[in-house]
UniProtKB/Swiss-Prot annotation:
Note: Major glycoprotein, comprises over 80% of the envelope proteins present in virus particle.
GO MF entries: host cell surface receptor binding
Subcellular location: Virion membrane; Host apical cell membrane
Annotated GO CC locations: host cell plasma membrane; membrane; viral envelope; virion membrane
Source species of the chain: Influenza B virus (strain B/Lee/1940)
Record-given protein name: Hemagglutinin
Domain of life: Viruses
Membrane topology, record value: Single-pass type I membrane protein
Lineage: Viruses, Riboviria, Orthornavirae, Negarnaviricota, Polyploviricotina
Alphabetized SUPFAM superfamilies for the sequence: Influenza hemagglutinin (stalk), Viral protein domain
Broad class of where this protein is predominantly found: virion
Length: 584
């Protein structure tokens, strides 16, 4: 009788190992995070730059004003503002104005007592408007002005275009006629609004004083005179100073023993002003009509070329990064925001050294291998797959996963850009609130506000880096699920994102996995391990199947009992419950 014995023999193969993971880099960079401190990453996007000083320029896409009157040669802005005869010309519109006179220059005309009024701020006031023009008509008729009749005085120290005697076009130096040279009580003149609707009217006026002899000769009164101006609820009082002046002139012209005090008042649309005066008045004539706003920044001339940003300390800047370090100062245009320290955004993955196959001995001495670290050679992406086997090492990037990581970084960049815009708007709003003060006073930067914004931006970058680095686990987990689904029953999961395949997986195989086109059948893969069935013929020696099975089961049972007894004895000996002596 023949019996068939089925012997099951599992056919093993030299399996390859496929793992998910992240690229490695030999040149790690460092970024700061909110909770992990400094972290090495494979790439960064620098967010800050440190500018170098350059010349000032015209702001790109914006009308930029250097001098109030570009075609008025050898004239200061104060000359133009007061209407010096040789400094009359076109004053173009501008959205941005350069305060190029660190200390506003004097006027090349009659000597002015600058320290008694804010007249040096008049050019700054005009720079603060987008549109400025000098009226064609006079605001006050000198022939009918109270305290007259008058004749209009001129001076050799203020020559006109023909080099004859002249005076400022914004004022009329009214001197009583010979039959009217006598002291008068204060008289009042109304200053009407003559500009167009929507324009502010800047009215310039003043008074003249000299020594007693000249005061008596010119006005018939050598005593100090009183003057008052009032507009928009602002009232200013003056008393003239008599004598004590050395002969001098502002620039060129004839030296003078007298002085003039010049002031201005701003009249809002439709509002009138008043001036109360005695002898020596300089009555308003042509007025400035101004509208719109022009941002003012300290700088220097000439303006060369164009720039994205005008910065008080660095001049014209072209924006290459959203933030900058260095000196903090006022800036206008498409400018980076000041931050205290350099900032970098992670543009890659957390740095890992090149991967090594680590081996650990497990149960019954079996060796389990897994990868630790990052991969070298994956230049097409950040996340992907690697296989190890007889073919060596193959690496392939998963472009979709890499793109998702890049999208997250782009999202963070967009967020930081939005934060930049919001902070710029906040700064702009604060500057607008101070606009009226800025027109009259040199602007001071709010350093506390800048420090606060810098801290907010730095925190936002730290949190962004934290999110980018932490999202790696999400990408790897998604990659592992994708790989497991593609491999199906053709591989066994061995942990750490690795799978042991039941087939070879070279570079071609790995590329298809990365592309999502992997098909197990293309690599001669059976559905499961093959079984070899071997038939054995036994001679009929009187043993039937039942007898054979009985012998086998008896032997197996005896062996099992023997092993159990041996294990029990070893256990008891180890617990000192049984002693064993061997005698020879």
């Amino acid at each position: 009788m023949k019996a068939i014995i089925v012997l099951l023999m599992v056919v093993t193969s030299n399996a390859d190992r496929i793992c998910t993971g992240i690229t490695s880099s030999n040149s790690p960079h460092v970024v700061k995070t909110a909770t992990q401190g400094e972290v090495n990453v494979t790439g960064v996007i620098p967010l800050t730059t440190t500018p170098t000083k350059s010349h000032f320029a015209n702001l790109k896409g914006t009308q930029t004003r250097g001098k109030l009157c570009p075609n008025c040669f050898n004239c200061t802005d104060l000359d133009v503002a007061l209407g010096r005869p040789k400094c009359m010309g076109n004053t173009p519109s501008a959205k941005v104005s350069i305060l190029h006179e660190v200390k506003p220059a004097t006027s090349g005309c009659f000597p002015i007592m600058h320290d008694r009024t804010k007249i040096r701020q008049l050019p700054n006031l005009l720079r603060g408007y987008e549109n400025i023009r000098l009226s064609t008509s006079n605001v006050i008729n000198t022939e009918t002005a109270p305290g007259g009749p008058y004749k209009v005085g001129t001076s050799g120290s203020c020559p006109n275009v023909a080099n004859g005697n002249g005076f400022f076009n914004t004022m009329a130096w009214v001197i009583p006629k010979d039959n009217n040279k006598t002291a008068i009580n204060p008289v009042t003149v109304e200053v009407p609004y003559i500009c167009s609707e929507g324009e502010d009217q800047i009215t310039v006026w003043g008074f003249h004083s000299d020594d007693k002899t000249q005061m008596e000769r010119l006005y018939g009164d050598s005593n100090p005179q009183k003057f008052t101006s009032s507009a928009n609820g602002v009232t200013t009082h003056y008393v003239s100073q008599i004598g004590g002046f050395p002969n001098q002139t502002e620039d060129e012209g004839l030296k003078q023993s007298g002085r003039i005090v010049v002031d201005y008042m701003v009249q809002k649309p439709g509002k009138t002003g008043t001036i109360v005066y005695q002898r020596g008045i300089l009555l308003p004539q042509k007025v400035w009509c101004a509208s719109g706003r022009s941002k003012v920044i300290k700088g220097s001339l000439p303006l060369i070329g164009e720039a994205d940003c005008l910065h008080e300390k660095y001049g014209g800047l072209n924006k290459s990064k959203p933030y900058y370090t260095g000196e903090h100062a006022k800036a206008i245009g498409n400018c980076p925001i000041w931050v205290k320290t350099p900032l970098k955004l992670a543009n890659g993955t957390k740095y890992r050294p090149p991967a090594k196959l680590l081996k650990e001995r497990g149960f019954f001495g079996a060796i389990a291998g897994f990868l630790e670290g990052g991969w070298e050679g994956m230049i097409a992406g950040w996340h992907g797959y690697t296989s190890h086997g007889a073919h060596g090492v193959a690496v392939a990037a998963d472009l979709k996963s890499t793109q998702e990581a890049i999208n997250k970084i782009t999202k963070n960049l967009n967020y930081l850009s939005e934060l930049e815009v919001k902070n710029l708007q906040r700064l702009s709003g604060a500057m607008n609130e101070l606009h009226d003060e800025i027109l009259e006073l040199d602007e001071k930067v709010d350093d506390l506000r800048a420090d606060t914004i810098s801290s907010q931006i730095e925190l936002a970058v730290l949190l962004s880096n934290e999110g980018i680095i932490n999202s790696e686990d999400e990408h790897l987990l998604a990659l592992e699920r994708k790989l497991k689904k593609m491999l199906g029953p053709s591989a066994v999961e061995i942990g750490n994102g690795c799978f042991e395949t039941k087939h070879k997986c070279n570079q071609t195989c790995l590329d298809r996995i990365a592309a999502g086109t992997f098909n197990a059948g293309d690599f001669s893969l059976p559905t499961f391990d093959s079984l070899n069935i071997t038939a054995a013929s036994l001679n009929d020696d009187g043993l039937d199947n039942h007898t054979i099975l009985l012998y086998y089961s008896t032997a197996a049972s005896s062996l099992a009992v023997t092993l159990m007894i041996a294990i029990f004895i070893v256990y008891m000996v180890s617990r000192d419950n049984v002693s064993c002596s061997i005698c020879l």
